[in-house]
Amino acid sequence: MKKVTAMLFSMAVGLNAVSMAAKVKASEEQETDVLLIGGGIMSATLGTYLRELEPEWSMTMVERLEGVAQESSNGWNNAGTGHSALMELNYTPQNVDGSISIEKAVAINEAFQISRQFWAHQVERGVLRTPRSFINTVPHMSFVWGEDNVNFLRARYAALQQSSLFRGMRYSEDHAQIKEWAPLVMEGRDPQQKVAATRTEIGTDVNYGEITRQLIASLQKKSNFSLQLSSEVRALKRNDDNSWTVTVADLKNGTAQNIRAKFVFIGAGGAALKLLQESGIPEAKDYAGFPVGGQFLVSENPDVVNHHLAKVYGKASVGAPPMSVPHIDTRVLDGKRVVLFGPFATFSTKFLKNGSLWDLMSSTTTSNVMPMMHVGLDNFDLVKYLVSQVMLSEEDRFEALKEYYPQAKKEDWRLWQAGQRVQIIKRDADKGGVLRLGTEVVSDQQGTIAALLGASPGASTAAPIMLNLLEKVFGDRVSSPQWQATLKAIVPSYGRKLNGDVAATERELQYTSEVLGLKYDKPQAVDSTPKPQLKPQLVQKEVADIAL
């Protein structure tokens, strides 16, 4: 085993050397203030912010595929959830004493409110058009069965009522009520089975690909914005004045050009890690990546689709990563409703759906190989889970579906391969390396280059993530009166928390719902529930989480 590891490592280092040596000779040079690498929602969001903050800055976006929003941002390559912790049970972990921690749920919800405000502002500006084309009201539900899980959901519901962000959530253990909310989930279910559900009417389904296309189309209307498709970054070199020379190859005709940029953003999804490494900044040495893909079962049968209007999330099974929770979702893609169930984890060494099988190997370096090995050794349960997922048969996946849709018929469903999610592995002084769930902005000390690594919650929090990037790399400008005024016009709640302020929460939800054409009714009284039994939990090794 050691010999195999050594051989693979040598190959990886060799591939990196070849990659770095094979610089394309550029025939011309272009200058730009901002270079956006990747045509996904992150680059589109950052470009939209900067267009308002500094309209005179020139921007260039390069994308290796023939169109924008074709990788992870594509509506078919993600679950399309407006992640706000209304139903995702992994955001409310149970403490050892049995109580429920809501800190992460509050943070996720606050972040999504920023996204809603950002999108609403762009609709008012005419940048985003026809909100129904990219965001729709789809109630968010949690659904569990079994005494322990029902008790957990009771405790979760009670805990979330402490936050103004979760007012309006409903709770029920009544079969008839839950059937009214989600008939597809309840029909054919054992009437004696102990079940519970929560439902929040203001949940959303979001087509991030459509948002991306509309944002970039608006940017293209300005003469100082350039979009270059079928263009792949081959090299990044820092200049003496701290600007960057980036070599970009035209994949159609084989030519190349140099782009000289004052600031570079690497928003290339799974490819971001390799490009960050190519930049040579010391901060990149702390990171490695591990790719995990996802599959969904899809139904377009009208009898199924018209019988389900909700996103219904369950609870991850014991020993599985919390984020692997199964869910059966209404999606609205290009104006058409479909139902998805999953995800089922898949494995490929590609960092992108349209990537190379050598991606994982070529990102392995002398700096990150040890953290990767530590993560593998310390997370055997995660390895077992991934192996078990890869080995699933068609029958296994169908049986998993029937737990959420008892009357499902095989002929109504097909299997769809969604996008790749590169998980962050970061060097850790104590453990050697840790698997980090979430996204992370990595930048140099000078604030001239930044990359976004990670996968979750991803697109639904693009607006707050890019806001964080602005604060990190343009700190002096962000603190200026001009930028402060503009940012508060884009995001009215910027600089303050909505949680705990009922009036402010209702005001922002009312405003964004009206502009985005979403359903919103002021919350009514809290549902009465049986008192949860806060049972002490067994202290178990935490299963590392991953994003699918």
Swiss-Prot record:
The family line of this record is: Belongs to the MQO family.
Q: Which reaction does it catalyse?
A: (S)-malate + a quinone = a quinol + oxaloacetate
Pathway given in the UniProt record: Carbohydrate metabolism; tricarboxylic acid cycle; oxaloacetate from (S)-malate (quinone route): step 1/1
Keyword Oxidoreductase belongs to the record? yes
Keywords recorded for this protein, A-Z = FAD, Flavoprotein, Oxidoreductase, Tricarboxylic acid cycle
The species is Escherichia coli O127:H6 (strain E2348/69 / EPEC)
The GO biological-process annotations, alphabetized, read as:
tricarboxylic acid cycle
Cofactor(s), names only, from the UniProt record: FAD
Q: Which GO terms describe its molecular function?
A: 2-hydroxyglutarate dehydrogenase activity; L-malate dehydrogenase (quinone) activity
E.C. code: 1.1.5.4
| A Pfam family the protein falls into | Mqo
Q: Does the keyword Glycosyltransferase apply?
A: no
Q: Which residues form a coiled coil?
A: none
What is the designated name of this protein? Probable malate:quinone oxidoreductase
